[in-house]
Amino acid sequence: MKYNFDTCPNRIGYGSLKWDKYKGRDILPLWVADMDFTSAPEIIEALQQRLDHGVFGYTIPFEEPAEAVINYLDRQHGYFAKAGWLNFLPGLVPAINLCCHAFTEPGESVMTATPVYPPFLSAPDYAHRELIKVPLSLNEADQWTLDIDAMEAAVRPDTKIFVLCSPHNPVGRVFNKEELTAVADFCERHDLILISDEIHCDLIFDEDAKHIVTSTVSKQIADRTVTLMAPSKTYNLPGLACAFSVIENTKLRARFRETIRGIITEVNCFGYAGITAAYNHGETWRQELLTYLRGNYNLVENFIKTELPEITFRPMEATYLAWFDVNKLGLKDPTEYFEKHGVGLTDGTPFDGPQHVRLNFGCPRARLEEGLELIAKAVRARDE
């Protein structure tokens, strides 16, 4: 490999959410969704060049990052977007919250499929909208999928938005065209705006799976979709706070931009430098990352099968976040239990997945092996 994914600098003391949570405690953090890899050297070089300029004034959206995004969408996903459809944002979480304000009124409802990334569940409440949760179901291949029949049973006249996570966090599914078409048809039948969070779209390690930008499924769904993306998960850049939305519909775009005014800050100059370098020069690094993550996923899958049959781990195709069903362990508080045994995992309860934990395998393999052994020791310690 050209790039090294087997080491990572010490992150303690740098304000790292992931690592400083357990500062001073003997707990290995394998929780929140950022990776323990240095970013692509090409991105670091671009940031250094911007730093060397020495002037860090107010920055407005400009041509270079917009061109990088448009070319990336075309090259990577066959999605022909226009610069006028883009809105640069400091993150996708504020964007989801903004959508609840922009496209619904107080008292109306927002639907999503669970378990899911917690901000999907909190955003409607923050906006004083009602949340409708529809559980994912299992298909014949024992993969998680969207339950359209359950969605039909739950939708109401006051439902205005469906929020989709594609690829899905935390279950790691890459929805195929048939599944996305079913969601699109559902939204059209009930006149719903589709908010499609596709931040994990470039982290597909299954070579048989392919990401489909939801708004490309049909012209009709494109006219009612807000697509949300960012390079932050793929290139390990969440601290740069640079994301974007793509909204084709003129009226929806105007409502979104009107809601932003005075609330959302502009993207900073380093965010623009990072997104431009990632999409223009980061592809070789990304391909090697996927190869490494594929190896890590295989390690997790094999370890659970052979060493921890008490944990249910279903097949996944994307992300670096493994979703474990630990119901059979009989733990009152699984996250707390594993922390007591030296490993920090993400609690599934805020995802609407009690008795589940999420493990981040975006880390050097030796660290992952250590974490899996700690989990195994914790499971065995139940009987001591």
Which stretches of residues belong to each language-model region?
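Conserved glycine-rich beta-strand-loop-beta hairpin in the small C-terminal domain of fold type I
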Residues: T276, Y292-E301, F313-D325
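Conserved core segment of the aminotransferase class I/II
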Residues: E45, K219, D223-R294, N302, ...
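Short Gly/Ser/Thr- and Asp/Glu-enriched loop/turn motifs at secondary-structure junctions
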Residues: K82-A83, P315-L321, D352-P354
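Conserved core of the PLP fold type I
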Residues: F56-D185, D202-L203, A209-Q220, E373
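PLP-dependent enzyme catalytic core of the Aspartate aminotransferase-like
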Residues: A153, E336-T346, P350-E384
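Helix C-cap/helix->beta junction micro-motif
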Residues: A127, R189-H190, I221, H341, ...
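N-terminal small-domain helix-loop-helix segment of the aminotransferase-like
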Residues: K2-G91, L98, N280, R382-E384
